[in-house]
Amino acid sequence: MLDAAELLHFRLPAVTADTLVVCVSQSGRSAETVRVADALAGRHSRPTVVAITNGADNPLAALADIHLDTRAGEEHGPSTMTFAATLVMLEAVATALGASSTDGAEAAALAAERLVTDAEATADSLASWLDDRPVLTLLARGGARAAAEMGALTLKEAARFPAESLQAAQFRHGPLELAGPEMAAIMFSTSAATRTLDVGMAAELQAAGARVLVIGDDDVLGSGGAGFALGRLSDCLSPAVAVIPTQLLAWSLARARGLDPGGYTRATKVTERE
């Protein structure tokens, strides 16, 4: 996975005719993503470009060799619907390329429904868990990093809260000094391969006095403290469910601050310039 602007300005020469480039843009109009597709389309020997967007009438879809429409519908503010819908499309792409089909969409949908059964009460309990702590770090490994990145972005966009997303192993290389009573941490742990490491980090942060929330499959909650059990979900779709508690937290914080969680004051829904 590469940031489109980094690919455009620094790594585009590494893309060859044998490369499959999957461009993701909610609007299909994001400046740097469209410029990547345009630059590749102008090559004599061009790679195959797949575009994933919400809707078909956009420049990115027009430039792509293959276009996948998430059909998420009209969306205002943070990309909550399109984030989940994009993960469904990415799993479809992976399956088409030969990955094992998990047929996990129904399980993910049911898990998401459970999390929002009493959305307002859950949102308020998450705000109480944070309890005015000024430091909130979202930690994850592997595919769960998508949930951590999106969660931190939503907290910034919707609640103007300066949450930070970090790869869990990188967190030990210095940022661990943040651990203490003023810190809150959300650990996303959806992979059995790193569960022991995730649980150990969560316990270490708790021992340092931090408030810790663990989001993962049923086994990970044995680490103690607060948490959300998601059940067994596919690796690709689990971030769409795991991110929901952070969305609810952002909504509660925005409401408490008198903000519109679906509105912007400086950013825009569609970013058409770098």
Region annotations inferred by a language model:
Residues 151, 199-201, 242, 265:
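Composition- and surface-driven signal marking solvent-exposed, interaction-prone regions
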Residues 66-184, 194, 257-274:
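Active-site phosphate/pyrophosphate-binding segments
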Residues 1-109, 181-184, 188-236, 240, ...:
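Glycine-rich phosphate-binding loops that contact phosphosugars or nucleotide phosphates
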Residues 229-274:
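Peripheral docking tails and interdomain loops at the edges
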Residues 1, 7, 52-53, 122, ...:
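Residue-level detector of functional hotspots within protein domains
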